[in-house]
From Swiss-Prot:
Catalytic reaction list: 2 methylcob(III)alamin-[methionine synthase] + 2 S-adenosyl-L-homocysteine + NADP(+) + H(+) = 2 cob(II)alamin-[methionine synthase] + 2 S-adenosyl-L-methionine + NADPH
CDD domains given in the database record: methionine_synthase_red
Gene3D superfamilies xref list: 3.40.50.360, NADPH-cytochrome p450 Reductase, Chain A, domain 3, Nucleotide-binding domain of ferredoxin-NADP reductase (FNR) module, Translation factors
Positions with a binding annotation for NADP(+): K293, R607, V608, Q609, D643
Listed GO CC annotations: cytosol
Record EC number: 1.16.1.8
UniProt source species: Caenorhabditis elegans
Domain FAD-binding FR-type: 271-516
The encoding gene: mtrr-1
Name the record gives this protein: Methionine synthase reductase
Record: residues binding FMN: 93-124
Cofactor: FAD; FMN
């Protein structure tokens, strides 16, 4: 028997990508793994009948299970299951997460604990990969342990194991003097400038042009002397090629309808794509202020789709955000296909491929255009992973570039990869600017670029037909290896929208962060005490809560009870970035909000955590109350989620005279009972 199970729970696709990579590597050494989402348990597999399972899973939202894993988590936690239900199962588990969130690794830990409780045997320690420091730092050692386990379990020879790793003896040209080092770097710069002036520009087509950047001595372009001199780099085998694109000499017929990403299913999406109309687009802060991030507001009209969506306060919608044309043009030009990018392109499986069970990705059309694929289907902004860098190394005519790219995807170069690629968030374009002689085959990019994921935005209004969203502009300067200043992918696109534009959106599955909470009637929401914490644009979702309560009070006064509804709103300076202050003050004057507490970090040195400590009398009842109250936290996760969590823990510990660990357990009880609910983002 050479088969075993690989199961994943993935919201954004990272866990699924790792799981697929495990499957491909296992097949290279002669095994026959089966790959399934965890929610396919009791449908396409039965965990209690498996002998070996590798699980790759993440947490999402407020410590929630990914949408293709939530059912699995519920099923393995049934009280009816016996303690030895999984006694025949050996398993390994890799958890993915982001330590900026207070709910870090919640689901991987929960699954691990429950599998053990049901009698399963974990073969080695669970790994917890942290996106804040680089997933690879934990993922790669875990994969090595897993394949060592497979080698032992299935008696796989050393020769076969060599099929998934290789050593590279390619060395940098021996550069001994400072003058020679400078000459080498100067050649890189000249190659790059030549690329800008020649290959990088096409008459009549706008093209992304890099900004000048002086790379430090140790950087993306050159590693340490130790790494540069290592003659035995352990680099992964390049992924097997399997796609062939055939471009005809004619355009795609005008009546061809290319549905968004081939209508490929995505976890958390509950509708097909549909068009909405942009009815307003405006600034909500001064766009010329240098003190704050610019914030904007977009309103869309759902039209006839309003009844289908039936959104509630706290719900979000996905926007189908495309890649910028300048970047798409540059990448297609570097691949040598820009001049045929708008002609009909047909994808097929290479009949000579050695890849087992090769399939065209479901999110791309088999008949399409290269421009359409690279604009709407493939993520060119996400930092390239090591498999893609491995392919880039094979796509350059410069041996020095090849050596450095091999270093970046090698086991020895993992820290360099994290420091110079993953952490600064380099894009594919940044990598191509840095290595001007890399000309990747377009088919390899189609195979290896991840799916372009739509961007979710919570709605800040409560109307049947229209939805308002508020967002901060994200800025990324040309530093740390990024070769062009840019805004966030969604920011740039949202900024371009004008009244009358039509855009595609998708309905998002309701989460726990909503009013009324799941399982509660609309009328009962008017009796619910609320503590809301919203720094920055985090306050926007609470506007939808308050508009809903205002309508409830107008339509059904008897259901609107005088209970505490407290909002802590964090901003830098209320005179410049306290967005929708007049709206919030209206809610106070009408009795919708009982308390509006403004925390100004720049003017008064007060963050929302300081406000919570200052107004203990308003906060404590929510930390000791029954299930009839709710705490909602919304905002940027960069430290805020953990800091607010610690603040509440400090308050509980001080009030009850208990240790911090015990206070955190009490807070965790609030989370488990859905009294403490977060909606935070990175």
């Amino acid at each position: 028997m050479t088969d075993f199970l690989i199961a994943f729970g993935s919201q954004t696709g990272q866990a699924e990508t790792i799981a697929k990579s495990l499957k491909e590597k296992a097949e290279l050494i002669g095994l026959t793994p089966r790959l399934h989402a965890l929610d396919e348990n009791e449908k396409k597999f039965n965990l209690n009948e498996e002998k070996l399972c590798a699980i790759v899973v993440s947490s999402t939202g407020d410590g929630d299970a990914p949408d293709n894993c939530a059912r699995f988590v519920r099923r393995i936690n049934r009280n009816s299951l016996e303690n030895e239900y999984l006694k025949n199962l050996d398993y390994v588990l890799l958890g993915l997460g982001d330590s900026n969130y207070s709910s870090y690794q919640t689901i991987p830990r929960k699954i691990d604990k429950q599998l053990t409780a049901l009698g399963a045997n974990r073969l080695f320690d669970r790994a917890e990969a942290d996106d804040q420091v680089g997933l690879e730092l934990e993922v790669e050692p875990w994969i090595e342990k897993f394949f060592a386990t497979l080698a032992s379990r299935f008696d796989i020879s050393a020769d076969k194991m060599n099929a998934i790793t290789e050593s590279s003896n390619l060395k940098l040209n021996q550069v001994k003097t400072e003058e020679e080092k400078k000459a080498l770097l100067q050649k890189r710069i000249e190659d790059e400038e030549s690329d800008d002036e020649g290959r990088g520009r096409v008459i009549g087509i706008d093209m992304l042009i890099p900004e000048h950047y002086d790379y430090p001595e140790i950087s993306l372009l050159k590693g340490s002397q130790t790494l540069s001199n290592d003659e035995n780099l352990r680099v992964p085998i390049a992924p097997q090629p399997f796609i062939v694109s055939s471009v005809s000499n004619r355009k795609l017929p005008e009546d061809t309808k290319l549905e968004w990403q081939n209508l490929c299913k995505m976890p958390g999406v509950v509708t097909k794509p549909f068009e909405v109309l942009v009815v307003s687009a405006e600034f909500v802060t001064d766009p010329f202020s240098k003190k704050i991030k610019t914030k904007r507001m977009i309103t869309v009209d759902f039209g006839d789709h309003a009844a289908e969506l039936q959104y509630e306060p706290g719900d979000a919608i996905y926007f189908c955000v495309p890649n910028p044309a300048l970047e798409v043009n540059f990448i297609l030009k570097r691949c040598g296909v820009l001049d045929i990018a708008d002609q009909q392109c047909e994808l097929s499986i290479n009949p000579k491929t050695e890849k087992i069970n090769a399939q065209i990705p479901g999110h791309v059309h088999k008949i399409t255009t290269l421009r359409h694929m690279f604009t709407t289907c493939l993520d060119i902004r996400r930092a390239p992973g090591r498999p893609l860098i491995r392919v880039l190394a094979e796509s350059t005519s410069d041996p020095n570039e090849k050596r450095r790219l091999l270093e970046l995807c090698s086991a020895q170069g993992m820290k360099d990869f994290t420091d110079f690629v993953r952490t600064p968030g380099l894009s594919l374009a940044d990598m191509l600017f840095a290595f001007p002689n890399v000309k990747p085959p377009v088919d390899r990019l189609i195979e290896l670029l991840p799916r372009l994921i739509p961007r979710p935005y919570s709605m800040s209004s409560y109307e049947n037909r229209k939805a308002r969203l508020i967002y901060s502009e994200m800025e990324f300067p040309a530093t740390d290896g990024r070769r062009h200043s840019r805004k966030g992918l969604a920011t740039d696109w949202l900024n371009s929208l004008r009244i009358g534009d039509k855009v595609q959106v998708l309905g998002k599955e309701p989460a726990r962060f909503r009013l009324p909470p799941l399982g509660m009637t609309k009328n009962s929401a008017g009796k619910l005490p609320l503590l809301m914490v919203g720094p920055g644009t985090g306050v926007s979702v609470f506007l939808s809560f308050l508009h809903f309560l205002r309508k409830l009070k107008q339509d059904s006064p008897s259901d609107f009870v005088d209970v505490p509804r407290v909002l802590f709103f964090g901003c830098r300076d209320s005179s410049v970035d306290a967005i929708y202050m007049s709206e919030l003050e209206m809610f106070v004057s009408e009795g919708i909000l009982t308390d509006l507490i403004i925390c100004e970090s720049e003017q008064k040195g007060e963050r929302v955590q300081d406000g919570l400590r200052k107004y203990l009398d308003k906060v404590l009842p929510f930390l000791t109350a029954s299930t009839e109250s709710k705490i909602f936290i919304c905002g940027d996760a960069k430290g805020m989620s953990k800091d607010v969590w610690q603040c509440f823990s400090d308050i509980v510990a001080s009030d009850q005279g208990i240790p911090d660990l015990e206070a955190k357990k009490k807070l965790m009880d609030l989370k488990k009972s859905d009294q403490y609910i977060e909606d935070v983002w990175g």
